Amino acid sequence: RITEIAYFESDGNYCNVVTANKLRSPIGMNLTNLEHALDKQLGNEATTFIRIGKRFIVNKRYICKVNIPKQRLVITDYDRFTFQLPISRDALKQLKALITLSTEKK
């Protein structure tokens, strides 16, 4: 299920999926190809995921905190997992601007 996926992380020509149960499984494609596959397979539900920088695709439902000075993105479900992902400062600034923009539209 989509809700079980916390994030995808690039690992060279492959990537890993990390689940809410903290299980890490390899996927035989790079992050860009995975991003296209998610769009194709999930349709409207693909918006559940957001590409952040070069290394991550994150489940937006679990974004908790954007820490630009420490270059960390905290994602959590407040129960089973909390991950602190190292993200570039520029990617975090773009994410924060996107979150602010979508919050203002509501």
Where are the regions that the model predicts?
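Basic, polyanion-interacting recognition surfaces, primarily
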Residues: 1-106
